Every structure is written in C-alpha cells, then in structure tokens.
Amino acid sequence: MKKRKPFITTITIVMIGMTIGLSSLLFTSCTSYTPTEKDLPVTTLTELQTAFPKAMYVEMTETATYAVKNAKGKVIGTVLLSSPYSDDINGFNGPTPLQIALDDKGKILEVRVLSNNETPNFLKRVVDAGFLESWNGLTAKEALNKEVDAVSGATYSSKGIQLSLKARLEVLK
C-alpha cells in the first residue's frame, strides 16, 4: 500500500498541472494578446509595427489569419501566414513561409519571409532585388493576377515565395 501512495500523488499532481495548463490555454486563446514568437509566428510586435505603426494587439480570427488592433481595440489591418496553405511549395531548400500584412482596405503593406531553410545568399538576393515589395499596394485579387519575374541567381527561392504568396491569397475570404 505504501508504494502506491507516491504513484497516486504523482498522478494527482500531473492531472492538476494539466488542468491548469489547459485552462490557461483556453483563456489565452479567447482573449487578445501581444504577440510573441512563441505564441504567434509574426516575428515581434516591434517588427509588425513597421507595417502597422499603431499596432498594439493581435488576435487570431481564423486559421493563419490575425486581426491587428490599435490601443482602442479597433482593427487596423490583417496579418496572413502562408503556412499551412503553402507547406508543400518549395523554394531552393524547402518551404518558405511568409507573413503578409494587409491594411484595413485589404491592400498588401508588406510581405515578410519567416524562419526557413533557404540558403541565406539566395534569400539575400531576393530581398536586395526588392522582390518582396512587388505586391505592395495591391489587393489580394490584383496580387494573384500579377506575374513577377524571378530574381536572377535565386530563381527557385523567388518562385517559391511567389507561389507561397499566391497559395495563401487564394484562400483569403
């Protein structure tokens, strides 16, 4: 009997911990919060503020879609993540997930490459060529119809980015 007591105590502690963790998770998913890399793959709030200077909160509204809110809680834009919609699209060295910032009228403000396995030199060529700015100012529909030439010396990387962007915009409501 004495050997079972520590086992039961351990099980009880684990169950209490799981209950607290689940409650915390449910509470967090039902409220607005300041994004962190752990909670939200949109880099950091400071970096998000390059597209949305007045951004104070981000709230998930549906799969890979986040409402960006100002201090008063007003939606000032949207952030779209290309993953999971583009997970099967490869650049030079695997998928290249994107963060796409849209203003409150649905125009693209910024396309940002998230953590990936692309060769840094190829990705640098894409960024330096201004490739990511090719869709700025366009609506999703306009961006879907725009063909952008691949960056010389980084063809696979740039095509992967373009296809990932289009895959995400195709499912935008």
Question: What are these model-derived regions, one by one?
Answer:
Residues M1, M15-M18, M56, M60:
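Detector for methionine-enriched segments
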Residues L26-K159, L163-K173:
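Flexible, solvent-exposed loop/hinge segments and secondary-structure transition points
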